Curated annotation (Swiss-Prot):
Main location: cytoplasm
PANTHER family in the record: MOLYBDENUM COFACTOR GUANYLYLTRANSFERASE
Record note on quaternary structure: Monomer.
GO CC annotation: cytoplasm
Protein name per UniProt: Molybdenum cofactor guanylyltransferase
Free-text note on domains in this protein's UniProt record: The N-terminal domain determines nucleotide recognition and specific binding, while the C-terminal domain determines the specific binding to the target protein.
Reactions this protein catalyses: Mo-molybdopterin + GTP + H(+) = Mo-molybdopterin guanine dinucleotide + diphosphate
UniProt entry keywords in alphabetical sequence: Cytoplasm, GTP-binding, Magnesium, Metal-binding, Molybdenum cofactor biosynthesis, Nucleotide-binding, Transferase
């Protein structure tokens, strides 16, 4: 039986290093950043949720359900994940940030295979050198654990998943897959990468 997989695109942050611009809506080569992310993951999942805490109407124009953090105060990616985990009945939830326009087109199958091979609860993507803590495939049943972690004042995603049985799936074969945009300079470099 094939596993049902939904996705959440995290666009709920403050984007301080982008001068406060809403990263998912910043244009990259004529399209909103989040549109590039959607195009990469849409063929790999059943449903997509967009986690946004501002500009929700703009995000809704992409045709997917927009959800805002249950926990107020811009508490970071865990808050968006918790909200999404409460909105899906899928077997697994893929978590990706809104500013990774070069995500692997084989992200889900490889991460799912890694989970199944190790009978793990979570798969974390890696670029071959570093883990990518906000590129995860996880079981939504872990929501209570994540909620308790956040409500205890913790914020770091990698500290949370370290408490569970997780596997790391390396995408060293796609070195630019997780390049993201935190500054206008990075945006410029990425625009050149996409047009190659």
């Amino acid at each position: 039986m094939s596993s049902q997989i939904d996705a959440v695109i995290l666009a709920g942050g403050m984007a301080r290093r982008m001068g406060g611009d809403d990263k998912g809506l910043v244009e990259l080569n004529g399209e909103a950043m989040i549109k590039h992310t959607i195009d990469r993951i849409k063929p790999q999942v059943k449903e997509i949720l967009i986690n946004a805490n501002r500009n929700q109407t703009r995000y809704a124009e992409f045709g997917f359900k927009v959800i805002s953090d249950e926990h107020t105060g811009f508490l970071g990616p865990l808050a968006g994940m918790i909200t999404a985990m409460g909105q899906t009945d899928a077997d697994y939830l893929l978590v990706v940030p809104c500013d990774c326009p070069l995500l692997p087109t084989d992200l889900v199958p490889r991460m799912l295979a890694a989970i199944k091979a190790e009978n793990a609860e979570i798969a974390v993507a890696s670029d071959g050198e570093y883990e990518q803590p906000v590129v995860l495939l996880l079981k939504p049943s872990l929501r209570d654990s994540m909620k308790a972690f956040l409500e205890a004042g913790e914020r770091k995603v990698d500290f949370w998943y370290a408490k569970h049985h997780f596997v790391v799936e390396s995408f060293a074969d796609q070195p630019n897959a997780f390049v993201n945009v935190n500054t206008p300079e990075q945006k410029q470099r990425l625009a050149m990468e996409i047009t190659k």
